[in-house]
Amino acid sequence: MLTYGAPFNFPRWIDEHAHLLKPPVGNRQVWQDSDFIVTVVGGPNHRTDYHDDPLEEFFYQLRGNAYLNLWVDGRRERADLKEGDIFLLPPHVRHSPQRPEAGSACLVIERQRPAGMLDGFEWYCDACGHLVHRVEVQLKSIVTDLPPLFESFYASEDKRRCPHCGQVHPGRAA
């Protein structure tokens, strides 16, 4: 018996789960309890956080277009993901996926994190570019672990205030 089931038609799977690939859910994990986190992420969505993944992330833009806002060597950059593009993001490159197109779909593959290996989530000041807030978590479930972290940041003006210039990060409305 195959642990993860028989092969299946992936485009059909995406169509069958399309209702989960848009707000408010936005993503669906393909397999549970494997060594890989294989997720399909849909649009539209807009994120204000930057993810610091301790391991590589693989992106395959299946439908539509998206882009990653990046912090590289202290400056902002952008990596466009056009339909059909693949991209391997190195570990610890801060990235903020932006999926402006409804109906878009991206396959994202990550490795499960070993115990003690933490993911970071950061927010930067729009006015001066300094780090406003960082939180680290032992990531077990994207669906259950992340919303409380984000809500805690959005709900606190103190957490959103830039320690360098005093500007308040607008939170989810950025």
Curated annotation (Swiss-Prot):
Q: What is its EC number?
A: 1.13.11.6
Keywords (A to Z) from UniProt: Dioxygenase, Iron, Metal-binding, Oxidoreductase, Plasmid, Pyridine nucleotide biosynthesis
Q: In which pathway does it act?
A: Cofactor biosynthesis; NAD(+) biosynthesis; quinolinate from L-kynurenine: step 3/3
Do you know which CDD domains this protein is assigned to?
Answer: cupin_HAO
Instruction: Please name the GO terms of the biological process aspect recorded for this protein, alphabetically.
Output: anthranilate metabolic process; L-tryptophan catabolic process; NAD biosynthetic process; quinolinate biosynthetic process
Q: How is its activity regulated?
A: Inhibited by 4-chloro-3-hydroxyanthranilate. Mechanism of inactivation involves the oxidation of the catalytic active site Fe(2+) to the catalytically inactive Fe(3+) oxidation state, superoxide production, and formation of two disulfide bonds between Cys-125 and Cys-128, and Cys-162 and Cys-165. Enzyme can be reactivated under reducing conditions.
**According to its UniProt record, which reaction does this protein catalyse?**
3-hydroxyanthranilate + O2 = (2Z,4Z)-2-amino-3-carboxymuconate 6-semialdehyde
Q: Mutating residue 47 to A: what's the consequence?
A: Increases KM for 3-hydroxyanthranilate 7-fold. Decreases activity 1000-fold
So where does Fe cation 1 get bound? 51, 57, 95
Q: What does this protein do?
A: Catalyzes the oxidative ring opening of 3-hydroxyanthranilate to 2-amino-3-carboxymuconate semialdehyde, which spontaneously cyclizes to quinolinate.
Q: What is this protein called?
A: 3-hydroxyanthranilate 3,4-dioxygenase
What species was this sequence derived from?
Cupriavidus metallidurans (strain ATCC 43123 / DSM 2839 / NBRC 102507 / CH34)
Lineage, uppermost ranks: Bacteria, Pseudomonadati, Pseudomonadota, Betaproteobacteria, Burkholderiales
The gene that this protein is the product of is nbaC
